[in-house]
Amino acid sequence: MLDESMKERMEAYRVLLLWQKEGSFIKESGLSPFAMELALGVCRRHLYLQYFIKSLVKKLPSLEVCMVLELGIFQMFFTEVPDHAAVATTVELIKAANLGEGSARLVNAVLHAARRSGQPQLPPQRVRRVSIENSVPEWLVRRWFDIYGGDRAEAMAKATLERGVEWIRVNLQKVSAPVVAQKLGLTGASILYDRYVQVPEEVKLKTLLESDSFAKGEFSLQNPAAYLVVKLLDLKPDLKVWDACAAPGGKSALMAEMDSSLDILASDVSENRVLKMHDVVDRLGLTNVRVECIDVLSKGLTQDDACSSEFDRILLDVPCSNMGVISRRPEAVYRLSPDSIKELMELQYSLLESASKKLTEGGILVYATCSPDPDETTKIINRFVKAHPEFKKRGPAVYPANDDARFDGFFAQALLKN
């Protein structure tokens, strides 16, 4: 019978295996706080932990044994778990996972060797060192070096290991930010734009999401970078707005909370994500948001009832590489490849071309990504404006994280249709 801490380690192990085998998202697994800390920590440092293991064995063991070893080494060197406890619980974990006595002996030997040797020496070549030290694939580090230069690229790689700052967005239609902060025990926390409250690191998000205040629709989780993106739309009362790639619905909800007179269509191509957006709208009590399942690239878009007329404002937050939010979504860095970025570029451009056809003359379209990469941002915009002279850039692009490190790494550019 496993005790509670061992159950949490087993949870983390199983979720990590699913991530490795099926590409599942760790944050969607519903793990307990300690198990989530372990799983996300191992995911963030996966390449480094693999490098560590390779320095101690002649041949890598099976995926299952490697995951157990990564959990053990992570606890020994990156948490406050005492070394002896990390070794003992990791050996117990491999036995509980029925991976065999031979695997248990191997894990025990490797962890004791790690304890004696300490962390391995990193390679001298800078790109390789930055890649391993920060668990960012070498091709991506080299790409960042080429685009941003060595110092900024190294800083970007280091930032992927940091926990993203968490914020709540208060629904000002129901309550004020200071009142919600007091209800949640966040008195004294930083408040931005009168509606965003920074969540201290020691506060568990699970506790906030289980509160009556959340159930009543008094707040949502959202980074303030979203507000800076929405501001570019220059919203006015009674406008028709289309949030074309809206899931999970946070920006649509923000707009509705900002002005209840707006007529907002929030759409997504995924039926499952659309169902979740309905839940968001219902929880927040928003009456001016319609939620629809719409494929922006569909040839029948112009005949679709929901999109039968033009919109005064369009927000196009396109699918992207997530390079600006790797600290929040650590799995993203391992999903990327040079080919996947090229595919994303073509999808992003196609979405922009299709959505722009539904913008009225004099209207504003905001193109946004949670990636600062030029291939997904400025190159898309410049290509589009060149091909469509009826559109022009409306002001400079916005990179919220450049001004405040607490913000997600978004890019947004407003386009005006002449």
Model region roles, listed by residue range:
Residues 1-418:
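S-adenosylmethionine
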